[in-house]
Amino acid sequence: MIMIDEIQEDAAQRMDKSLNALKQAFARLRANRAHTSLLDHITVSYYGNNVPLNQVANVSVEDARTLTVTPWERQMVPVIEKAIMTSELGLNPVTAGTVIRVPLPVLTEERRREMVRLVRQEAEAARVAMRNIRRDSNHTIKELIKEKEISEDDQRRAEEAIQKITDNHITQVDELLAVKEQDLMEV
């Protein structure tokens, strides 16, 4: 039974990681307010290495629709500006000396729908990842029964427990998706 408990615990931990990754992906998509996490995934070239933007500059919220990026080194201004422009966020930074202001455009209905579509894709990818984790766990359990290390009753109970874990995590994904869709469609 210890092996089965370990398999269930492993499945739950892996599904938690998928859920956390989804939460981070959702945090990057902001509809109605500026937030520093919007630029978290942007990397810049710094002395030949790609590093996250927040390691070469201070990112702060100036107001509800503007982010301010202040590089720690003057020569990083054009590099950071280009990285923000070429990101898939559709932002146009404005540079004033060593300060880069990133105004967030007011979202059109079309852009909101596009963001909802992206959010749904992220949620579906998380669901698929969780189903794959369930499949891997069930496969491991089937291997144990082939090796006669557990009984068929143990197998059935373990598979039911893993299914409950999966259902719980997929329900959480659906709840996060509903909240995010509502957030994105608010004007």
UniProtKB/Swiss-Prot annotation:
Q: Name one GO cellular component term.
A: cytosol
GO molecular function terms here? Answer: ribosomal large subunit binding
CDD domains given in the database record: RRF
* Protein biosynthesis keyword on record: yes
Q: Where is it located? A: Cytoplasm
Question: Belongs to which family?
Answer: Belongs to the RRF family.
Supply the name of the protein: Ribosome-recycling factor
Q: Which organism is it from?
A: Nitrosococcus oceani (strain ATCC 19707 / BCRC 17464 / JCM 30415 / NCIMB 11848 / C-107)
